[in-house]
């Protein structure tokens, strides 16, 4: 058994999730690959696997039960947070992980190939690239953990939205001023997240066109 299996299982249960042993094993394979590649490619500033478990895996898992169903785009996915973690836990969901950083996308493509994952692809491009917009089309859910600015994320997501799409932004503090700027066009539901062993404010913002 993986040394972090029980810790991940207990953490996911505290988040209200009932993940299968298979899903937990996949998540830990992903973390092991991230730790290994990180030594050479600097995919994440977090190097300690125990810290990674909390700040990457459990943090990403904390949004799982509040995400609407449907095809998902993860913008600025970096090393795959939260997009890859969602894809591993929800094999029925089609996911596209998008980032402009070649090293990070190479890591994700290799991991996808090694595990023969069928529901997720990784694309190296800029989110505003018109060819990418035309090729990928529209999504039901658009996630990001990467954007400092909520308004910037909404603008980046805009070309990928259909009328019912949900923008799911992971934030620390609630960006009250930016929500105020967007309220004429988007409804916003704020969900407080409680990540086990993480003593930081975390929130999920679900935005939808009015």
Swiss-Prot record:
Gene3D superfamilies: Vaccinia Virus protein VP39. It catalyses: guanosine(527) in 16S rRNA + S-adenosyl-L-methionine = N(7)-methylguanosine(527) in 16S rRNA + S-adenosyl-L-homocysteine. Its EC number is 2.1.1.170. Pfam families: GidB. It is found in: Cytoplasm. One of its GO terms (cellular component) is cytosol. S-adenosyl-L-methionine binds at residues 76, 81, 127-128, 145. Its main location: cytoplasm. One of its GO terms (molecular function) is rRNA (guanine-N7-)-methyltransferase activity. The keyword Protein transport does not apply. Keywords: Cytoplasm, Methyltransferase, rRNA processing, S-adenosyl-L-methionine, Transferase. It comes from the Bacteria. Specifically methylates the N7 position of guanine in position 527 of 16S rRNA. NCBIfam families: rsmG_gidB (TIGR00138). PANTHER family: S-ADENOSYL-L-METHIONINE-DEPENDENT METHYLTRANSFERASES SUPERFAMILY PROTEIN. Belongs to the methyltransferase superfamily. RNA methyltransferase RsmG family. This is Ribosomal RNA small subunit methyltransferase G.
């Amino acid at each position: 058994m993986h040394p972090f299996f029980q810790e991940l299982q207990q953490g996911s249960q505290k988040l209200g999730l009932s993940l299968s042993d298979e899903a937990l094993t996949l998540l830990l394979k992903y973390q092991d690959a991230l730790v290994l590649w990180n030594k050479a490619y600097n995919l994440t500033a977090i190097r300690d696997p125990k810290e990674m478990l909390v700040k990457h895996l459990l943090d990403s898992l904390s949004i799982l039960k509040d995400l609407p169903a449907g095809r998902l785009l993860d913008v600025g996915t970096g090393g795959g947070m939260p997009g890859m973690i969602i894809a591993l836990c929800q094999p029925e969901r089609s996911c596209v992980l998008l980032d402009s950083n070649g090293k990070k996308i190479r890591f994700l493509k290799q991991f996808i190939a090694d595990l023969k994952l069928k529901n997720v692809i990784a694309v190296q491009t800029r989110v505003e690239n018109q060819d990418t917009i035309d090729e990928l089309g529209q999504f039901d859910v658009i996630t990001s953990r990467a954007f400092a600015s909520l308004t910037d994320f909404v603008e980046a997501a805009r070309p990928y939205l259909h009328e019912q799409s949900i923008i799911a932004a992971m934030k620390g503090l609630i960006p009250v001023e930016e929500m105020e700027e967007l309220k004429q066009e988007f409804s916003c539901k704020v969900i407080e997240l409680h990540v086990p062993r993480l003593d930081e404010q975390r929130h999920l913002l679900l935005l939808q066109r009015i």
